[in-house]
Amino acid sequence: MLNEIDPFRQRLLRAVFGGEVTGHDGEHIDDLLQTPVLPDVMVMNPPFASSVDRSRDKHIAAKHLIAVAKRLAPGGRLVAIMPPGFTPERDTAHWSRACGLLTPRLALTMPGQVYRKLGTSVETQLMVFDRVQEDCEMIRAIVCDLDEAFSSVDAVAATRTEERPAQRLAAVPQALQQ
């Protein structure tokens, strides 16, 4: 399932992946999707500063993350590029809501220079969350470049179980799935 609100990026996604690309406002994605699909893995890069109506909203990325988290399958993984202000210290209310749905695994602060070739220089966080109810310590680090990020990303990747949510569902007798 692919969702992108920008028409140009929608066309790119169709060209690369084929199939349908929805154009929903990600802030309301869980309410707007008609299908009961619960993806195992979601990757997102939400807007950092403004909503669809272009009003300024410093919490818009957090609102997108929470909406996506509601749609993620139990046991699933969410990888997000988030603004540096999305932390338990700087955005307590949204962080608490997100952590009511997800377990944070990784928060890597990345300097804007990483994206210079792509025409932007905004500092970001690469974040990984799992939809599981377990206590674990989130890896928090500041990296200078992508090469430095690999060891932290690999460490978090190793925490993902081999059995995916869809596999667990397939193992449940049909009568119990309803």
Report residues per predicted region:
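Conserved Class I SAM-dependent methyltransferase catalytic core
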Residues: 3-9, 50-129
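A short acidic, Gly/Pro-enriched loop at the edge of an enzyme's catalytic core
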Residues: 32-43
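Short, hydrophobic beta-strand segments that form beta-sheet elements in well-ordered domains
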Residues: 1-4, 21
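Conserved SAM-binding strand-loop segment of SAM-dependent methyltransferases
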Residues: 18-28
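Conserved NAD(P)H cofactor-binding loop of Rossmann-fold oxidoreductase domains
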Residues: 46-47
